[in-house]
Amino acid sequence: MKRHFFSGKIIASPSLFLLICTAFIFAQLAHAQVSSKKEEKLDFNIPKDTYFNNAVHPKGTGKSFFNFGDILVARAILPAASFSEGPSSGQYIGSGLINQQPVPFLNKQPIQGFSAIVNNYDGTFIALSDNGFGSIENSSDYNLRLYRIKPKFKTFFLSGNGTIETKGFIELRDPNNLIPFAITNHFSESRVLTGADFDIESVQRTKNGDYWIGDEFGPFLLHFDKDGILLDPPIPLPDYENPGKELRAKQNPFSEESSALRIMNAMRAHAKTNGSKSPVMSPWFVMLDDNNENTSVNSRENPPAGLKKASSELHNVSSLNKAGHQVVVYTVNDLENMNLLLELGVQGIISDRPDILLEAVQNFDKNKDGQPDYIDANGLIDVNIFDAQGHRGSRNLRPENTLPAMEAALDFLMPTLETDCGITLDGVPILDHDPHIEASKTRKADGTTYEFDDEVLVKDLTFDQIQKTFIADKILNGRPAQTNDLTLSPVAVAFAKQNELIDPYVMPSLQQLFDFVSFYIEYYKNGPGSTTNQASKRWKNASKVRFNIETKINPRTDTDDRGDIFSDRTVDPETFTKAIADVIVANNLTDRADIQSFDFRTLLIAHKQYPEIRTVCLFGDFPKVGDAGDGTNLQDQNGQNTPWLAGLYWPYRNTSQETPFRIKSSGGFEGMALSTDGTKLLPLLEKSLEGSSSNSLLIHEFDLENKKYNGNSFDYPLNEKASAIGDFIMFSNTRGLIIERDGSQGDLNGFKAIYEIQLDQNKRQIEKRLNVDLLKINDRRKISLPGLEGDIGIGKDFAFPFVTIESVVVFNPFLIGVLNDNNYPFSVGRHVGTGLPDDNEFILLWLDQPLGRRWRNPKGIKNETMVNDIKAYPNTFDEQVTFSNISKGNDVSITIYDISGAVVKKLLVHEKSTDASSFIWNATNDLNQKVSQGIYIAIIEIDGVFTKKKLIKK
C-alpha cells in the first residue's frame, strides 16, 4: 500500500498542522475523483453511530483516506490490573506472581478478557468478559458478567485521556434451574454462572433487550434477559452430517468425560458456602482417562443386555488437579498399576494390599534424585503429599473391616485407614460394608447355621446383639493372601482381651476403631511391641493416622435381589451422617477423619451440619442388571437421572464412543453475528472440525423466533496463516466482518487481520476480502505514545500484537472499533520490555477502504446522482453556500463540520430531493448563530453514497 509522509521541520501550531493535513487530504481526494467519476453505493444498513461520527474526527462520515492506510484515530485503555467487586478469584491458576501480578485475587474479580462487544449508541458499550482464566479447569471462581464500559478516547486531535471507565455489570445467572447439568453454584439460590460452566465468547442483543451468548464448551447458545437471567435451557448445536447427533466439544456436559469435573465443582462450592473443606474425588481407578488399554470396566466394554457399550476413559487426573481437586483412586492391588498411577500423578491410592502399596510408595522417585518422593524424614508416608489407604483395613490380607484388618494396615504404615459403616438399631456406627450381615463373611459365635436366607439387616439389630452374635473371620474365595491367623494380629488379640470382646474378629464399632488405634500406639510405644524392629515407625504413624469412613447407604427406590427396596435397607441419610459425624467430633478427630460416600446426600448434610469434617466423593459404575447389582452410583434409575448424586446430572454411558468430540478444544462459538433484520443469529465456530481436511469453519443459521437452527450453514475459509477467528458481525444483509488471528503475541510479523465477508444464501462458501491488517496501522498523530519501556507496536507504525483479538464494532462505513482480549494475567503482547500483562485496549480505525464497497461491477444498476457532479458554490463564501445538481428522488443528508471535527450544522437529514433540487447553507450553526471565518467541511450523503466539499468562510 502506497504511503505518503511529510518531511521538513516540525509544525508547532496544531491548527496549522490540520490546515496542511486537510489540504493534503483533499489533494488526494481530488486525485481519486478524477480516476473514478461515479461511485458505488455502499452495502451498509446498520444504524450509524452519530456519537462517534460527531466526536472523533473531521472526516465525519465522509470519504476514506485512500492510499493513506488504515488510520488510528482514537485509543482508550483499561489497565490490566482492573478489578470489580466479587468473590476471590484466580485460586486455581497458581500462587505468588504471574507476570508480576500477585495471585490469587482476594475478594475481587478482574475486569478482563473482553470477548465481544455491543454498542449502546450513547458512548457506552456492553463488553462480554470471557470465562476467566482460559480453561474449564481454572475458572470456577470467575463469575460470568457483561460489563458496561465508557471509553474516554484519546483522539486524533489528542483530546480525551485515553481511559476506559466501568459503569457496572450484569451478572449471568440461572435462578430458575433451566440448566439441566451440574454448574459450580448448582446448590445456591441465585446460581451465578462461572467460567467453569460456560466459555462465553460472543454476544448479540436483540430488539427486546435480550442477550444471546455463544459458548465454546458445548457449544451452546445461551439466552438471557436484560438483567442476566437465563431464559431457556442451553441450546446445543445439531450435527447435520450425522442426523440425531450433536456437534460437541470435549467439555460438553452431556458426555461423561467432563461431568465429574462439573460435579466436583458443584460439591466444592456447596462445601465452601457452608464453611467446609474442599471435597476429595475418589474414582474407581479403571475409569481414569489414562490411555491404558488394560484398565477398563468389563460391563462397559462388554455390556449385558439393557446397557450401552461405553468408554471407560472418563476421569482425567491432570484436568481435575488443575481445577484444584485431589484425586484418590480405589481399589488398586498390583504393583504395576500402582506404579502407573504414581506416574500419572494421583494424590492417593486405596488398596486391599497395603504391603504392596507401601513398597510402591517407598520406591517411587519420579524426580530421580535418589530419594523417594513421598517418604518423610521418619521413613513414613507423608500424607500431606500422598495418601496411601488400607481398603477396609487390608481386605486381601485379613477379613475386611475388622480390627485385625486395621492392624495389618497400620503394620504396613498406611497413613489412612479406609472403612465402611452401617448404623445399628440403637444408632451405633459399626464397621460393615453391606446392609445385611453377610453369611459369606460372618459366622455365628454359637456355631448355629447362618446362611444367605438367614441374613439380617444391620439396622434391625442393636450393637450389643451384633457383637455377641457374629464373628467376621471367614476367608473369601479369590483372595489367596487373606488369612485369619490370630498370631499375625497380636494387638487385636490384646485389645479384645482387655475389652472383653468375644473374639478379635467381632464387628467393631467406629468408636472401637478409634480406641483400637490409641491402643495400638501404646502397644508399640510403651507396651509389648516396643522392642520390635518397626515399633517406632508404627506408633508414630498410628499417632497421626487418618480415617476415611464411608456411609454405606443406597438411595435407589427399586428392589434388590431379595425384593427389598434399596433405600429401606438402612437408616435415612441424615441419621446415617449424624451418627458417624458425632463419633468423629466426640473423639476430636475432625481434622483426621473424612466422611466418604457414593450417596452425595450424606455429603451435603455433612457440609451443612459438620463443616469441620472433610468429605470424599466416590464415583463408580456397578450397574444393576435385572436382580443383580445395586446401581452404584452413576447408573440411571428407570430412565431418570441417578439418585446417588443429590440431583446432580450424570449422562450415564454417553461418551465419545457414541458421540465423538468433533469440535476442537476452544473451537466453539467464538464469533456470532446478528442479521441486520434481527431475525437470525449466525454463530461461527472458532476452528475447523476434528478430522476436517480443509481449514474451513462452520457458520450455522439460528432462527430467533422459533429458537431453532434452520439447517442452513456456510463454510468460512480461514487463512492458512490463521489458527482461529476472533469475532464475526454483520453490517448489512450480506456483508460482515470477521477477525482472524494466529497464536502469536508480541510478534510484528504475526498474523492479525480483519476480513470483510460476503454471505450469499445460494452459496455454501463465503467470499472474503482483506480489509485491515491489524499489525500495520497508521498512527500519524502518535496517539499511542507514550508507552512503557520496550513496548512494541506503538508510535507511527501502530500494531495490535495480541494473541487474542476478539471484538470488532462498526460505527459507519469508514469507522470501526477493535478490542483485544488481554487474557489477564497471562498474555504479554504489548509490554514485552517490562514483561507486564497486556491491558484491554479499545482502538478506533478510519478505514482506507470503506465497508460495503462493491467487489465487482454489478449489472443493471439504475441511474443515480453522480455525487462528484454535485456543486457547492461559492466554496469561498461570505453569506451562504448553495449545493446543487441533485437529481429528483434522492435521499439527501448534508452535515457541516468545522476543522476540529465538531458538527456545526445538520443542514439536511434524509430529505427527498425534488426536480433540480438545490439546498442553501446560510453560514449559521444549529443555534442559528453566524459562524466565524475558517475552513469547514460539508459531508454529503446521497442514497448512501458519500462525498465531501471543502468550504472557506472569509
State each model region's role.
Residues 890, 915, 932-935:
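A glycine-anchored, Pro-Gly-centered beta-turn/N-cap motif
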Residues 920, 929-954:
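C-terminal tail/sorting-segment detector
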Residues 1-12:
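N-terminal secretory signal peptides that target proteins for export/translocation
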Residues 15-27:
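Bacterial N-terminal signal peptides
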Residues 858-888, 896-902, 933, 950-954:
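Surface-exposed, proline-anchored Ser/Thr-rich loop/turn motifs
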Residues 245, 254-646, 651, 655:
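Phosphate-group recognition and catalysis centered on beta-loop-alpha active-site segments
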Residues 33-255, 259, 273-276, 640-857:
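Sequence/structural signature of beta-propeller domains
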